[in-house]
Amino acid sequence: MGEFIHTNFLVKVNLSNYLKIKNKIPSNVNILAVSKGFKSQEIKTIQNIGQNDFGESKVQEAYEKQLLLKDLKQIKWHFIGRIQSNKIRKIVQNFKYIHSVDSFEK
C-alpha cells in the first residue's frame, strides 16, 4: 500500500511539472513519457490531459498495458529498450516507433 501511495505521489508531482512545461515547448516537439513501471490507470490519467506518446522498454509489460488501453486510439507507443531477436515481431506489431537497435546480425 505504501508503494502505491508513493508512486501516486510521484505521478502527481510529475503531472504538475508536465503541465508547467507543456505550454512552453514548441508545437513541433513531442514529450515522450516513459511509462515503464506505471500502471495503466496512471497512463490513462496523463493521457487525459493531452500526453499521447509513451515509451516502454519491456515488451511484455508494454503489451499488457496496450491491451488494457486499446480503446485510447490517440496513444502512440514507442519502444525504447534493448531489442532481443526473439521479440522483434512483437515489437514491430505493437509499437508505432522504435528508438533503438541493439545490433545487426550478418
Question: Model-found features: residue ranges?
Answer:
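Conserved alpha/beta-domain cores
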Residues: 4-106
